[in-house]
């Protein structure tokens, strides 16, 4: 699988209209072109509310290229700027199909910049260290990706789902909510 990360900044007064366009037209266009939308997220804390992050899965690069020929660009009167790039999964997430039970109301989007030589340690620490602890608290890892191109430093994208901003806070190591977490998972 290959994934497209699309960052769209709408005109400040067009955010709601862009979201409606995605829900009524764009997501269906993606599916008809062979893509599988994984998520469409907007800024809540940190990123502006009129910035959208969309992750779409494709069978391979050829399927992505074929889809580009079929897709129409977003309406110019809604979009101020847009970038897209290909990402590859580097861990056990994303799952081939993300079940509804794994969907969350709020997602944390984190970007890490690491030395490519440290990738296997980074993935191991994520999958066997951090993820079991926060998943035991109800969080759900949507995916861990890096760019298709090899770069120095290597950029890593992590999307983690939470039930609410309060739930996110409860999963922090410094939170008082940590008292009920299996101490073996905190090691």
Regions flagged by a language model, labelled:
Residues 1-4, 14:
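Hydrophobic, helix-prone linear segments
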Residues 3-9, 39-69, 104-113, 145-146, ...:
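Short, well-ordered beta-strand segments in beta-rich or mixed alpha/beta enzyme
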Residues 14-38, 71-74, 118-144, 176, ...:
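Short amphipathic alpha-helical segments
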Residues 16-18, 64-66, 94, 120-122, ...:
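Short acidic, gly/pro-rich beta-turn/loop elements at beta-sheet edges
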Residues 89-92, 113, 117:
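Short acidic/polar capping segments at secondary-structure boundaries
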Residues 36-50, 72-105, 137-157, 180-187:
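Glycine-rich beta-strand-turn "strand-cap" elements at beta-sheet edges
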Residues 7-8, 20-26, 75-82, 111, ...:
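A generic short-segment signal for beta-strand/edge and adjacent turn/coil regions
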